[in-house]
A protein has these predicted regions:
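C-terminal catalytic "cap/lid" subdomain
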Residues: 1-119
Length: 119
């Protein structure tokens, strides 16, 4: 079976929801969710915390024809929707910095943290 871009993001969210995980970490080629495309816009700012996922946040992932999305961010946001709905937090962080995993698990501000809805 051939994987398509984004399949792993969705699959990991489904598994995290099924096992009632407290935290899902998705690693990417950028530090997290930005208010613009950091590959094209040097003034794009990292969004450290997303309390809830709304149309504005989804548009940052490339939805609604915004053109701001960076490779697979839309699927990461879909994964965030899945897990936050069931009470699991999610973090998007830079996968080229594996030592950050300790900081993420320790609750330090790394990447973009999506807050879980109350169960």
């Amino acid at each position: 079976m051939e994987n398509t871009i984004g399949e792993n993001d969705t699959l990991s969210a489904i598994v995290a929801a099924a096992v009632h995980a407290d935290l899902l970490i998705l690693l990417s080629d950028i530090d997290g969710l930005y208010d613009g495309d950091p590959h094209r816009d040097p003034t794009a700012k990292l969004i450290p915390v997303v309390p809830s996922i709304d149309a504005h946040i989804l548009a940052l992932g490339g939805g609604s024809g915004s053109g701001l999305g960076t490779g697979g961010m839309a699927t990461k946001l879909k994964a965030a929707q899945i897990v936050t709905e069931v009470g699991c937090q999610m973090v998007i962080a830079n996968g080229s910095k594996p030592a950050l995993l300790y900081d993420i698990v320790g609750g330090k501000p790394v990447g973009t943290r999506f807050l879980a809805k109350e169960k």
